[in-house]
């Protein structure tokens, strides 16, 4: 039986007792089924030459390493998060490309390949995750690794007009073709990748999703990531903590709109605040009868763009409360702090509306978690951005354009006044999708498809030596 090797930028600690997110839950499920290794950065800076830190529990080994301060800055802070993250979320205006950062990104991917190489066994299958590791398969191939290597991109893949603006776009595209299987959250992401590729070289496609470019053959497929709906329902049900129970009692005559997102410019938080203001302005009958709570814990607080959005939200919250607030009623609560995941699921359950309106998002698991946390007999309503990957599955949500504040305000009004029968029907349809496409289904489909790939060999390469030339200008 093939062993599974998972490679990601960060690894979940083996002693993590709870609060695991989508990637960790899916990866651990796959590793428990096949046995294997989870390899990644420890999250700490230090001496890169130190031996790998290894912990084994059952049939899973965790292997982690430190990064030097310089590599952490170049690979993680600069290229991954100041170039790839904004570009892949359609924010070229925030891209800060620096050649030394690109060189550091490549250097760290090569370093990781060197560290992983001695741990790879002949029949291992390798599953690589996310934008930090786009060149990783290429580095392994240079070192003679012919194992099956799959890649899953958790964030959006931008259109060619965006992606090809990145100075190393051609190198990144060719490196991605060294994976055997490329997985994306949505069909739009998959097609955007192929469009970018076709703009740089001739791509031969056979059997729909099998392709050859630069003499390398690979497959593309869509694997929308899921959640653990049963676990979330369990966390959401049951008695409330004392303070939350008191708050719910105090707000029994107030309808609650609730959002929780990482503080990130891709999440559309300023636009969300303005849409809520439009609701209060356009539908004054709701004033004094609703409350919008936005939880947005700080993320990458050292980056200027994130500092700017935090200050903007603080200013907007104060302005909206000053304009519309009344004695005994504060319309908007903005909390820039972290809350326990289990507590959030309980808050979801007593919320009347879940407001999830990112400007661009690979999937957005918060939307799925909100649905899973609801009481099926009296569910809340999900208002969801058309630019979240989840909108492709949760079609019974109220789908909105987050750039149109009046559209979002109208959807909020509809959600607040929706009859119970319609709420139950919409929730049941979304929950059915979430249960069918849960986190285990996601990892099982990917691993199954990766196992079906024929491992690389000289014979396979000879079959792929077809005419794939760079396109002429």
Label for each model-derived stretch:
Residues 1-473:
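Catalytic cores of carbohydrate-active enzymes across secretory and cytosolic contexts
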């Amino acid at each position: 039986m093939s062993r599974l090797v998972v490679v990601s930028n960060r690894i979940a600690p083996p002693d993590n007792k709870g609060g695991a997110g989508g990637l960790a839950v899916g990866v651990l499920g796959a590793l428990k089924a096949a046995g294997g290794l989870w390899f990644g950065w420890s999250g700490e800076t230090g001496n890169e030459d130190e031996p790998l830190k290894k912990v084994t529990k059952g049939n899973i080994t965790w292997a982690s390493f430190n990064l030097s301060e310089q590599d952490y800055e170049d690979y993680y802070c600069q290229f991954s998060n100041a170039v790839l993250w904004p570009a892949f979320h359609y924010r070229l205006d925030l891209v800060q490309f620096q050649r030394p950062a690109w060189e550091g990104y490549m250097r760290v991917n090569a370093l990781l390949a060197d560290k992983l190489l001695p741990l790879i066994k002949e029949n291992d299958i390798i599953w690589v995750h996310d934008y930090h590791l786009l060149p990783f398969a290429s580095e392994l191939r240079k070192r003679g690794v012919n194992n099956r290597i799959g890649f899953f991109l958790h964030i959006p893949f931008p259109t060619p007009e965006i992606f090809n603006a990145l100075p190393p776009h051609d190198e990144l595209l060719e490196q991605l073709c060294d994976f055997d299987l490329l997985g994306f959250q949505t069909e739009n992401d998959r097609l955007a990748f192929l469009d970018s590729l076709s703009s740089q070289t001739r791509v031969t496609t056979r059997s729909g999703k099998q392709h050859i470019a630069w003499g390398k053959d690979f497959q593309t497929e869509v694997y929308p990531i899921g959640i653990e709906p049963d676990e979330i329902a369990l966390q959401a049900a049951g008695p409330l903590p004392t303070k939350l129970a008191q708050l719910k009692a105090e707000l029994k005559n107030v309808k609650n709109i609730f959002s929780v997102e990482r503080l990130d410019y891709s999440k559309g938080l300023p636009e969300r605040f303005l849409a809520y203001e439009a609701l209060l302005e356009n539908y004054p009958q709701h004033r004094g009868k609703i409350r919008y709570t936005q939880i947005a814990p700080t993320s990458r607080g050292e980056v200027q763009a994130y500092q700017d959005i935090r200050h903007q939200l603080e200013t907007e919250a104060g302005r909206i409360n000053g304009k519309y607030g009344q004695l005994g009623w504060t319309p908007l609560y903005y909390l820039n702090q972290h809350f326990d995941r289990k507590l959030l699921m309980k808050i979801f359950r007593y919320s009347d509306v879940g407001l999830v309106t990112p400007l661009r998002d690979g999937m957005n698991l918060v939307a799925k978690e909100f649905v899973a946390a609801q009481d099926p007999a009296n569910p809340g309503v999900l208002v969801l951005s058309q630019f979240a990957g989840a909108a492709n599955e949760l079609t019974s949500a109220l789908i909105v354009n987050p750039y149109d504040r009046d559209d979002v305000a109208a959807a909020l009004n509809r959600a607040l006044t929706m009859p119970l029968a319609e709420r139950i029907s919409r929730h049941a349809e979304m929950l059915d999708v979430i249960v069918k496409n849960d986190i285990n289904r996601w990892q099982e489909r990917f691993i199954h498809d990766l196992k079906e790939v024929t491992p690389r060999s000289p014979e396979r390469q000879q079959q792929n030596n077809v005419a794939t030339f760079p396109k002429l200008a």
